[in-house]
Amino acid sequence: MSNSAMSVVILAAGKGTRMYSDLPKVLHPLAGKPMVQHVIDAAMKLGAKNVHLVYGHGGDLLKNTLTDGALNWVLQAEQLGTGHAMQQAAPHFADDEDVLMLYGDVPLISVDTLQRLMAAKPQGGIGLLTVKLADPSGYGRIVRENDQVVGIVEHKDANEAQRQINEINTGILVANGRDLKRWLGMLNNDNAQGEFYITDIIALAHADGKKIEAVHPSRLSEVEGVNNRLQLSRLERIYQAEQSEKLLLAGVMLLDPARFDLRGELVHGRDISIDANVIIEGTVKLGDRVKIGAGCVLKNCVIGDDCEISPYSVLEDAVLAAECTVGPFARLRPGAELAVGAHVGNFVEMKKARLGKGSKAGHLSYLGDAEIGDDVNIGAGTITCNYDGANKHKTIIGDGVFVGSDTQLVAPVSVGKGSTIAAGTTVTRDIGEDELVLSRVKQVHIQGWQRPVKKK
């Protein structure tokens, strides 16, 4: 089947009562993004011509969160079953296309399994994804005659013999648009739930002489749905275990794979070492021989070769050239940039600031809206005072500057190359090159000073 002649319908109208949340169920995050986004991503990777998202509860929130302009939004005002949901989308189906039906709360479905399902779909028939369970209680059973699928019966409507069947319906199927529209128009709600079941089209297709081909997923977790937070947490751990396995096989050393979370994409070089409880968010790119210490969080960062991030550092939208060292307990906020061999130590925060080649900020400093040259020493307790209560201002420090401890640089201000700022100085005016600047109150000694004594 040609992917150019395919549309996807994603059912996402459920409220998710058992989540006990005001957030629509399909927006609850798995691996850092809404679970329905995983399904949308799979549909896009398949090359679907159209992706129809059927929504109900929390429509405005869904639209504000899922901003991909390629989605076609289909309202299901009343939730009257899966068949009813598909009926709402049916007017959008082309007669000559195949339509793949997915679920927003089944987030781990793989592109590989869906490709096999579409390839297995008989001409004019239905491709159906099924699994076999040791305990199929509660699920719709696959009814076969002479090994051919002839129908699906829901658990509540099944007789005792049918309840012994262990092959169950996952709900995922693909069918021709023209046939699907006709079968959807023939559905009724004459069942124990009083709902329109999409599963009834299997019997309708069989009655039309159409063949139904069943395909099994590569892993059972691919078709596990989410109805409560326990199930969501289970799928999160399954997903993370799979990502850890892929990284290990690709040469990344995860010192404790069970305590690593990938909530985005990790692009990596060779000989990477990542300690326990590290979280990767967004897109993170690591060069060769990078070491990430325990408890670090990296989001949308580029880390050069031979860098070391010590434990409990948080980096977001930061760029590090080669041979940089960061932390422990450092924070690099968006716009932080370190040149080759730069060092940021414990309890140093950077935001929209560049630290030049070989420059160091070792301890307890804030560097915001700053351009810092090469071979600069930033003493402990240095603050770039960048905010005047209304606007942000820039601090520029030239090459080879030595900034003493407990220095405040009140921006906008610039410091010429080679200058020295004495400890405890508040800089309010520009400094030229090779100057010594200090602005302390003269130290006074009073002999025999007696501190006040509390009255008893």
Curated annotation (Swiss-Prot):
Q: Which InterPro entries match?
A: Bifunctional_GlmU (IPR005882), GlmU-like (IPR050065), GlmU_C_LbH (IPR038009), Hexapep (IPR001451), Hexapep_transf_CS (IPR018357), MobA-like_NTP_Trfase (IPR025877), Nucleotide-diphossugar_trans (IPR029044), Trimer_LpxA-like_sf (IPR011004)
User: Is Methyltransferase included in the keywords of this UniProt record?
Assistant: no
Chain intervals for the UniProt region annotation (Pyrophosphorylase): 1-229
According to its UniProt record, where is this protein located? Cytoplasm
Write out the pathway annotation from the protein's UniProt entry.
Answer: Nucleotide-sugar biosynthesis; UDP-N-acetyl-alpha-D-glucosamine biosynthesis; N-acetyl-alpha-D-glucosamine 1-phosphate from alpha-D-glucosamine 6-phosphate (route II): step 2/2; Nucleotide-sugar biosynthesis; UDP-N-acetyl-alpha-D-glucosamine biosynthesis; UDP-N-acetyl-alpha-D-glucosamine from N-acetyl-alpha-D-glucosamine 1-phosphate: step 1/1; Bacterial outer membrane biogenesis; LPS lipid A biosynthesis
The Gene Ontology terms for molecular function here are: glucosamine-1-phosphate N-acetyltransferase activity; magnesium ion binding; UDP-N-acetylglucosamine diphosphorylase activity
The residue stretches assigned to a coiled coil in this entry are none
Which residues participate in UDP-N-acetyl-alpha-D-glucosamine binding? 11-14, 25, 76, 81-82, 103-105, 140, 154, 169, 227, 333, 351, 366, 377
> Which residues does the annotation say bind Mg(2+)?
105, 227
What does the entry's cofactor note say about binding and number? Binds 1 Mg(2+) ion per subunit.
Query: Which reaction is recorded as catalysed by this protein?
Result: alpha-D-glucosamine 1-phosphate + acetyl-CoA = N-acetyl-alpha-D-glucosamine 1-phosphate + CoA + H(+); N-acetyl-alpha-D-glucosamine 1-phosphate + UTP + H(+) = UDP-N-acetyl-alpha-D-glucosamine + diphosphate
**Keywords tagged on the record:** Acyltransferase, Cell shape, Cell wall biogenesis/degradation, Cytoplasm, Magnesium, Metal-binding, Multifunctional enzyme, Nucleotidyltransferase, Peptidoglycan synthesis, Repeat, Transferase
Q: What is its main location?
A: cytoplasm
Q: What is its EC number?
A: 2.7.7.23, 2.3.1.157
Pfam families recorded: Hexapep (PF00132), Hexapep_2 (PF14602), NTP_transf_3 (PF12804)
Q: Where is this region: Linker?
A: 230-250
Q: Per its UniProt entry, what is the enzyme's top EC class, as one word?
A: transferase
Show the active-site residues. Answer: 363 (proton acceptor)
Query: What is its cofactor?
Result: Mg(2+)
A GO biological process of this protein is: cell wall organization
**DNA damage among keywords:** no
- The segments labelled N-acetyltransferase in the record are 251-456
Q: What's the stated role of this polypeptide?
A: Catalyzes the last two sequential reactions in the de novo biosynthetic pathway for UDP-N-acetylglucosamine (UDP-GlcNAc). The C-terminal domain catalyzes the transfer of acetyl group from acetyl coenzyme A to glucosamine-1-phosphate (GlcN-1-P) to produce N-acetylglucosamine-1-phosphate (GlcNAc-1-P), which is converted into UDP-GlcNAc by the transfer of uridine 5-monophosphate (from uridine 5-triphosphate), a reaction catalyzed by the N-terminal domain.
Q: How does it assemble?
A: Homotrimer.
The family this protein is said to belong to: In the N-terminal section; belongs to the N-acetylglucosamine-1-phosphate uridyltransferase family.
- Protein name in the entry: Bifunctional protein GlmU
- Organism this protein belongs to: Serratia proteamaculans (strain 568)
